[in-house]
Amino acid sequence: MTTPHSPKTIDELMSRANDMAGLTLGQLADSHGFITPANLKRDKGWVGQLIEHELGALAGSRPEPDFLHLGIELKTIPVDKNGKPIETTYVTVAPLIDIQGLTWETSVVCHKLQTVLWIPIQGDRDIPVSQRQIGSPILWRPNEEELALLKQDWEEIMEFIALGQVKQLTARHGEVLQLRPKGANSRSVTQSIGPNGSTQMTNPRGFYLKIPFTQSILSRAFGIYTQATSR
């Protein structure tokens, strides 16, 4: 099994990501001696782990950007035949206790989304996992409007948590960012702030980017790319 080194510069990272574009997951897996699963029902994190390995990501599941020394978070994003994201994008686990003094600027969500390297990957279920193609990379930094929307949603969600109302939050809350249960199963529980400042047990929660938001990122990036190459 090969172990690629972590890129020292953004240019090196992007060069490696561009070299990967056009390959299938099976081809990439074979190059590292990985076994490609027949489906992803029991291996939901396999694609992300494969791409992380190829690009030399270091963070793993730690609450920091994947390429901390470059300030870049890596996100694989499955898309359908029309280029639309198939699912929401997980960002990080949500803090449910000890949140006094926490601000958007000091939050893990803010840090992880400062600069994101998006890797689109064919996600249609009728395409065998080994034959799904890796798309062109997108290096994205949120603009002022996107940052404002993210901050607004994060602050509203954290207010619910601080008031002990985490159980009232649904995936419908938030324009671009949502809070959803995050755990291996519904039996996973953790502490959270309860009514009147008490402590209660609840399912772990995670922050996710909504599909229309990630769709706008992809559309804008590939729209610019198309214009640039059609001159």
From Swiss-Prot:
State the Gene Ontology terms under molecular function. DNA binding; endonuclease activity
Q: What Gene Ontology cellular-component terms does the record carry?
A: cytoplasm
Give the originating organism. Shewanella woodyi (strain ATCC 51908 / MS32)
- Predominant location of this chain? cytoplasm
Q: Which SMART domains match?
A: MutH
* Keyword match Hydrolase: yes
The entry's function note states: Sequence-specific endonuclease that cleaves unmethylated GATC sequences. It is involved in DNA mismatch repair.
Query: This protein is called what?
Result: DNA mismatch repair protein MutH
The protein's superkingdom reads Bacteria
Which HAMAP family does this entry report, sorted A to Z? MutH
Give the encoding gene's name. Answer: mutH
Alphabetized Pfam families for the sequence = MutH (PF02976)
GO terms for biological process, alphabetical: DNA modification; mismatch repair
Q: Which UniProt keywords apply?
A: Cytoplasm, DNA damage, DNA repair, Endonuclease, Hydrolase, Nuclease
Q: Report the family membership.
A: Belongs to the MutH family.
State the compartments where it is located. Answer: Cytoplasm
